[in-house]
Regions:
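Cysteine-dependent PTP/DSP-like catalytic domain, specifically the C-terminal lobe
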Residues: 125, 129-163
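Hydrophobic, Leu/Ile/Phe/Ala-enriched alpha-helical segments that form helix-helix packing faces
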Residues: 16-22, 97-104, 127, 131, ...
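Structural alpha-beta junctions
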Residues: 2, 60-63, 103, 129-137
């Protein structure tokens, strides 16, 4: 059974610390998809549940790590109060993600975004639907309830075009 675990940023970092995984010790059999916000959101959006200074990628990009920066919105682009723009996953990012997932479909996946509820869950939903013949062990503490529909649709569209 392969792991398909989705985390909040905080829980992801805790799990990586427990496993003692960093850039030097991350096993090749583990695949990480790290989703952070774009620079305009990191700099300009702050709330009780989001502080941009903590929204960073833990691992350097490498063969088994995909770092993506896009925002948790339900449309392609949103002009935000405060004069900045939030941007969802782009076609290029979705194509890259689909190819990356296809190349690593036989490994364990550890996926995170800030809350672990929307963007990362869209990836979990996509992977489970794209590879239904694989028996996935998902994170029981974080069920896939509210995946970002825009992200999910972009991944599915890319898969139809490139796989």
């Amino acid at each position: 059974m392969q792991k398909l675990y989705c985390f909040s940023r905080k829980d992801f970092n805790t799990y990586m610390d427990i496993c003692d995984w960093d850039d030097n010790t991350l096993p090749d059999s583990v695949t990480v998809i790290s989703i952070c916000c774009t620079e305009p959101v990191i700099k300009n959006y702050h709330s009780e549940h989001y502080q941009g200074k903590h929204d960073i990628h833990r691992f350097s990009s490498r063969n088994n790590v995909l770092n993506l920066d896009f925002d948790d919105i339900d449309e392609e682009v949103r002009e935000c109060s405060g004069g900045f723009t939030a941007t969802n996953i782009t076609k290029e990012q979705a194509d890259k993600a689909v190819a990356f997932i296809e190349a690593h479909k036989d490994s364990d996946f550890f996926i995170h975004c800030n809350a672990g509820k929307s963007r990362s869950q869209a990836f979990v939903k996509y992977i489970k639907e794209q590879y239904p013949y694989i028996e996935w062990d998902t994170n029981p503490k974080n069920p896939c309830l509210y995946p970002n529909v825009y992200v999910s649709n972009m991944l599915k569209r890319s898969a139809r075009e490139i796989l």
